[in-house]
């Protein structure tokens, strides 16, 4: 198994879109077309919010990504903002897309509530972390996480945070030494089914020499 870590390239987008669609189970509550658009909105949004990227490539195939953001240094290129705008607009053009987007509007609101309740200012954020389900348990997630930690240390950032929830493997973050700070429960109505989810903020404190 040969794994290479490198910076994000635009040519990685489609493969990463597929990983995100699979990781966040978009097909469980949306048609395939809308699931693809949701993944595109999510990925383009994350790509407006980073200063460091590492993509994992195994045997020539993209299998994971991590994005970290040094908030003080962050500047988003206009092209990334425009890509996000186009993705959101495309989602909102259909009735199904508009209905599904309400769920994600709720999630954004919950994340903001978590930040407000946590009442801490962090110099950095882990903006995106995803690994293909085919490659989990092979140490790729740990490699990506360690690369982000090295970046934080080089930048002399003493802490960072991330948002996660019960749809993700949030136990991974605890194994990497992150601490859960706050949590919030929310019930969604998806396709007539009640879905109970918990949302968290995790933090990591670094010793910066």
Predicted region positions:
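Conserved catalytic-core motifs of GNAT/GCN5-like acyltransferases
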Residues: 161, 179-196
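Conserved beta-strand-loop-alpha-helix junction that forms the acyl-donor binding cleft
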Residues: 127-129, 133-136, 161-171, 187-190
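Conserved active-site alpha-helix within GNAT-family acetyltransferase domains
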Residues: 142, 154, 166-183
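Conserved GNAT acetyl-CoA-binding A-motif
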Residues: 123-124, 152-165
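Conserved acyl-donor/pantetheine-binding loop and adjacent beta-alpha core of acyl/acetyltransferases
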Residues: 72-124, 189-195
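A short beta-loop-alpha structural element at the N-terminal edge
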Residues: 2-18, 70
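Conserved acetyl-CoA-binding loop-helix of GNAT-fold acetyltransferases
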Residues: 137-150, 175
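A short helix-loop-beta-strand connector motif used in the catalytic cores of GNAT acetyltransferases and
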Residues: 43-55, 71-76, 125
